[in-house]
Amino acid sequence: MGELIVVPTPIGNLEDITLRAIRMLKEADLIYSEDTRVTKRLLNHLEIAGKQIVAFHAHNEHKQLERCVQTVKENTLTVLVSDAGTPAISDPGFLLVRACVEENLPVSCLPGPTAFVPALVGSGFPCDRFIYEGFLPHKKGRQTKWLSIKEEERTVVFYESP
C-alpha cells in the first residue's frame, strides 16, 4: 500500500522550503501537481530530476480522482503539491486527501507555507481566535458573504485575488 504526502511549496521565494519537503520530493515515486510547469521549475531549482509529474488541478480533479486514489494505492510514495503554499488550502487537493482517508490509505501533511498565516501574524490583529473563509466570491454572493461575516467577533481571514 502506498502513502499520500501533502507537501507545501514556497510562496514567492523558492528558498522557503523545508528540508523534509525536499526529501519527500526526492523520494517520491509520483508527484501530483496543480501546474506541472511550476512544479518542474521548483524541481529544477532543487536539482531533482527524473520525476513523474501528473497534472491534478481544479479542472480535472473530479475526473482524475478515482485513478489518482488507485495510483496512491499502488505507489510507494505519492506526493501532492500546489503551485504555492499548502495543497487543499484554497487550492486543489482536498478531494484527493478525503478520498484517500476514506480508503484508509495513509495520508501525511508536512508543515510549511500557507499564505494566510504570515499575513495574519503580521497584521497586528488578534491571532488567538480566527476563522479562515478562503476566497470571497467575485460577484454573485459577495454581498451575502460580507453580511454573513460582518458580525463575527473573531479575526476573519480571507483571500482576495488580484
Set out the residue ranges of the language-model regions.
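Glycine-rich, flexible N-terminal cofactor/catalytic loop recognition
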Residues: 1-58
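Beta-strand/loop-alpha-helix module characteristic of Rossmann-like adenine-cofactor folds
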Residues: 2-3, 114-162
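Short glycine-rich anion-binding loops that position phosphate/pyrophosphate groups of nucleotides
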Residues: 11-12, 83-87, 162
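Short active-site oxyanion
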Residues: 25-31, 104-107, 155-156
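Short beta-strand scaffold positions
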Residues: 33, 91, 159-160
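Conserved helicase motor
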Residues: 54-63, 135-139
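Short phosphate-binding loop-to-helix
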Residues: 58-73, 92
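Short glycine-cluster motifs
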Residues: 73-132
